């Protein structure tokens, strides 16, 4: 598995950590055996990317192994916030779904202990076509 440096993630503010811990506790109470969390909405700019990255950081900081999959194949905010654009662009979920690279090529270890990331990388105006196969 490849290594990926995420130099653009800010440290979590104490108030943010408190809110995320409350969310974590509520999720654990509601679904104690859950292993997958999906964040989604129907409109942009609602905070999905920010919440996903911050929750990922929090869980990793608590010693939990975490995989963050960026499924936004139209406008990847995670790639943008992690600095994976321009010359730092890497193969990601869109490449895997199109069959151009194997899964191992899009799964990255990060410097955050216990975390892996599958960036969306590469955008498409018709993501449903990639998801059909």
Where are the model-predicted features located?
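P-loop/Walker-type NTP enzyme "switch/lid" segment
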Residues: 2-25, 29-32, 40-46, 61, ...
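Walker A (P-loop) ATP-phosphate-binding motif of ABC ATPase nucleotide-binding domains
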Residues: 36
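Hydrophobic positions on the alpha1 helix immediately C-terminal to the Walker A/P-loop
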Residues: 50-51
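Short amphipathic alpha-helix
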Residues: 54-55
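Rossmann-fold NAD(P)-dependent oxidoreductase module
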Residues: 58
């Amino acid at each position: 598995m490849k290594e990926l440096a995420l130099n653009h993630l800010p440290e979590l503010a104490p108030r943010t950590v408190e809110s995320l811990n409350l969310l974590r506790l509520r999720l654990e109470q509601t679904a104690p055996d859950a292993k997958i969390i999906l964040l989604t909405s129907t409109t942009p700019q609602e905070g999905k990317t920010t919440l996903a990255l911050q929750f990922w950081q929090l869980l990793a900081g608590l010693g939990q192994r975490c995989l963050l999959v960026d499924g936004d194949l139209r406008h990847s905010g995670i790639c943008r916030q992690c600095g994976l654009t321009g010359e730092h662009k890497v193969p990601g979920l869109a490449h895997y779904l199109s069959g151009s690279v194997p899964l191992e090529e899009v799964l990255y270890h990060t410097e955050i202990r216990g975390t892996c990331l599958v960036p969306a990388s590469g955008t498409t105006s018709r993501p449903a076509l990639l998801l059909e196969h």
